């Protein structure tokens, strides 16, 4: 077992060796530009790009013509949300999303608000899931877009996307789904789930970073205003010379995900449960954040009461985990996802996200259980609040002196 141990698979995944192997020739001998139509170098590159497009489409039940290459899921989210809003704004300027979306969606929505669009931000239930009835109630005649993620990046909670998609479809509203954290882990099918636009990332499924895709439905056709102007690549949706090695890597990652997903889901769920039960055996006052029933296999988001998340992370340097999402973990604000779910500020501050994946082992899980057990106990020994609770004091009944 190698130290440090990686348990942050929601932030990124290692590139699978089989993916790297598929990519390497496109850095060396096969260096053509896929847009070069007049010679064999370009034809070979284009052939590789189209084969990868087929693989990504197959993984989500789409047709290859519906896959647009991007630089990653942040770009895909921006292109979907802003592109659809700008195209359909003559019909209305109302958008609907959830408070626990990824920042790429939330900040795109805020940017649109500054341009005169109106956005309804829905609250999830206590278990982190969004009730489809709330989406239905939020729709208005001028609603043009609903954007709800499939699986949350912090809690791993899976939303009832098929039902939300059906509600949007019946209302004639475009439905975008950020499927970054679910694709390759659990089934995601654009037809069964009534999805019009879907964001996909390569580096969340053992492919390279800086590579993504956007699914854009053709029947009924969904239209977007391009965010990037240029040579008209990707049917005008996304200009710019294609990243052939990255695309080949994403295609291979999609193929492996399709072939290995179901067996891997069983294995990783077993590891997650081993971790959860082990931590619960070691420690008291442990809270799992979000639904355990509706959750991606490798996610465990836990609050260790009376322990500061940042202090705990420093104490467990040998295990790579995160408190909050990697995109926002530079700020010490409590997780906005957990706060939107109604988790108290103290518990949100003490939350740790474990992410298990393809290369995680039982040995690593057992090591993490022992390490977290030891370090949490040590930090709690320094907490007078923990001592008071153990002595039966109800902290809610105490009137604290106001220092200000």
From Swiss-Prot:
Give the reactions, separated by semicolons, that this protein catalyses: (sulfur carrier)-H + L-cysteine = (sulfur carrier)-SH + L-alanine
Residue positions annotated to bind [2Fe-2S] cluster are 327
What is this organism's lineage?
Bacteria, Pseudomonadati, Myxococcota, Myxococcia, Myxococcales
Residues of the signal peptide:
none
What InterPro entries is this protein classified in? Answer: Aminotrans_V_dom, Aminotrans_V_PyrdxlP_BS, Cys_deSase_IscS, Cysteine_dSase, PyrdxlP-dep_Trfase, PyrdxlP-dep_Trfase_major, PyrdxlP-dep_Trfase_small
Q: Does the keyword Chaperone apply?
A: no
**Active-site residue numbers:** 327 (cysteine persulfide intermediate)
Q: Spell out the HAMAP family in the cross-references.
A: Cys_desulf_IscS
Q: What is this protein called?
A: Cysteine desulfurase IscS
């Amino acid at each position: 077992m190698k130290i440090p141990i990686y348990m942050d698979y929601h932030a990124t995944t290692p590139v699978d060796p089989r993916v790297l192997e598929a990519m390497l020739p496109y850095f060396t001998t096969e260096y053509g530009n896929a847009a070069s139509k007049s010679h064999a170098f370009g034809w070979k590159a284009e052939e590789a790009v189209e084969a990868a497009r087929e693989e990504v489409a197959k993984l989500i039940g789409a047709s290859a013509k519906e896959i647009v290459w991007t630089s990653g899921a942040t770009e895909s989210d921006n292109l979907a949300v802003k592109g659809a809003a700008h195209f359909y704004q003559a019909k209305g300027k109302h958008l609907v999303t959830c408070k626990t979306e990824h920042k790429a969606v939330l900040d795109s929505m805020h940017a649109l608000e500054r341009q005169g669009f109106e956005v309804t931000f829905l609250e999830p239930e206590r278990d982190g899931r969004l009730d489809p009835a709330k989406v239905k109630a939020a729709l208005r005649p001028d609603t043009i877009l609903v954007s709800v993620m499939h699986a949350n990046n912090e809690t791993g909670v899976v939303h009832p996307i098929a039902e939300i998609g059906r509600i949007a479809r019946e209302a004639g509203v475009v439905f975008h789904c950020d499927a970054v954290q679910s694709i390759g882990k659990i089934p995601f099918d654009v037809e069964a789930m009534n999805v019009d636009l879907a964001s996909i990332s390569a580096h969340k499924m053992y492919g390279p970073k800086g590579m993504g895709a956007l699914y854009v439905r053709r029947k009924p056709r969904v239209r977007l205003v391009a965010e990037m102007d240029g040579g008209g690549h990707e049917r005008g949706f996304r200009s710019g010379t294609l990243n052939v090695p990255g695309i080949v890597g994403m295609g291979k990652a999609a193929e492996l995900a399709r072939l290995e997903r179901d067996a891997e889901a069983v294995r990783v769920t077993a590891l997650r449960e081993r971790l959860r039960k082990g931590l619960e055996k070691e420690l008291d006052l442990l809270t799992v954040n979000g639904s355990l029933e509706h959750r991606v296999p490798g996610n465990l988001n836990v609050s260790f009461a009376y322990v500061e998340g940042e202090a705990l992370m420093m104490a467990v340097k040998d295990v790579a985990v995160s408190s909050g999402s990697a995109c926002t973990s530079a700020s010490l604000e409590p997780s906005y996802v957990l706060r939107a779910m109604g988790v108290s500020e103290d518990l949100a501050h003490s939350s740790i996200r474990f992410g298990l994946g393809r290369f995680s082992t039982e040995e690593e899980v057992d090591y993490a259980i022992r390490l977290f057990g030891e370090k949490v106990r040590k930090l709690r020994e320094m907490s007078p609040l923990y001592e008071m609770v153990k002595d039966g004091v109800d902290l809610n009944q105490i009137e604290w002196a106001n220092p200000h």
